[in-house]
């Protein structure tokens, strides 16, 4: 006998929510899914009327669902937001060029303006070119740093007040695990924040912070949303993949593990004696940075000098001496070659 929707008790249930275990029909699931995101937005006071909000759009399921739901809620509850799709072209053949076609279709479907910024125009390099230089081991370091800055630069071009991204509950729980394993205190404290960037960068918020990835997939499937599902060709080597596998194993045993990990990260406190990085600005490009040179400028300098490992890992003492173009002794030259090769 078909199971009836536990909400309306009228229509046949088509799914069992991974997050709550409730059996729901499509319409009740859509409403519950959207209302939970609305409640997150309202309780965290993410937006204010009249703000220009950039939606980080990659063409993937998360950003596509985010764009769709933001448009729905903006109209349903009269948020009064000016929504804009903001995409980054990393220059990955066979992946980003195809996904950007999806973003362009989303632009037409949702009737939202679209701005695309590229690594090539901003940095003079594509990810394909970078991978040829650095190999597959550290490519995600470059992409993560450049992508974050590219979104901010695109937002500045458009006068955007806030950027919202499609980071979901699974993503945040994975990040908590990664930062805990790396002992990264600064990131461990702020990775669960629903809004970041109060130090001077354009604020970023995560409306999908408490939304399970499985439910995002179900929403996109039943809504028949147009999204790109191919994984980045360079990501299988990413460190995040190990945290993801571990998280999925935990979720299989205890479905609430995802939210539990997020709440654990939120409740972690940092000892007052621990020195936290002080945010300033990069002396070269003006971007927010806790060092005299931002990470993007250090990475770019290494690429342009033919020393791609220059900005990888903790900064060597010689890095800034090289970047400031100070002469090196023979001993320093030998040490530098050992570090960057």
UniProtKB/Swiss-Prot annotation:
Which SUPFAM superfamilies does this UniProt record tie to the protein? Adenine nucleotide alpha hydrolases-like
**InterPro entries linked:** CTU1-like_ATP-bd, CTU1_C, Ncs6/Tuc1/Ctu1, Rossmann-like_a/b/a_fold, TilS/TtcA_N, tRNA_thiolation_TtcA_Ctu1, UPF0021_CS
Where is this chain's protein located in or outside the cell?
A: Cytoplasm
Task: Return the similarity comment.
Answer: Belongs to the TtcA family. CTU1/NCS6/ATPBD3 subfamily.
The EC number(s) given in the record are 2.7.7.-
Q: What class of enzyme is it?
A: transferase
Could you tell me what this protein is called? Cytoplasmic tRNA 2-thiolation protein 1
A Gene Ontology biological process noted in the UniProt record is: tRNA wobble position uridine thiolation
Query: What domain of life is recorded for the organism?
Result: Eukaryota
Tell me which PANTHER family the record gives: ATPASES OF THE PP SUPERFAMILY-RELATED, CYTOPLASMIC TRNA 2-THIOLATION PROTEIN 1
What GO cellular component term, any one, is given? mitochondrion
Organism, as annotated: Xenopus laevis (African clawed frog)
**Is RNA-binding among this UniProt entry's keywords?**
yes
Q: Which UniProt keywords apply?
A: Cytoplasm, RNA-binding, Transferase, tRNA processing, tRNA-binding
* UniProt-listed Pfam families: ATP_bind_3, zn-ribbon_14
Give GO terms: molecular function aspect only.
Answer: nucleotidyltransferase activity; tRNA binding
**Matches recorded under PROSITE patterns:** UPF0021 (PS01263)
Please state the pathway this protein functions in, per its UniProt record. Answer: tRNA modification; 5-methoxycarbonylmethyl-2-thiouridine-tRNA biosynthesis
| Function text | Plays a central role in 2-thiolation of mcm(5)S(2)U at tRNA wobble positions of tRNA(Lys), tRNA(Glu) and tRNA(Gln). Directly binds tRNAs and probably acts by catalyzing adenylation of tRNAs, an intermediate required for 2-thiolation. It is unclear whether it acts as a sulfurtransferase that transfers sulfur from thiocarboxylated urm1 onto the uridine of tRNAs at wobble position.
State if Nuclease is listed as a keyword.
no
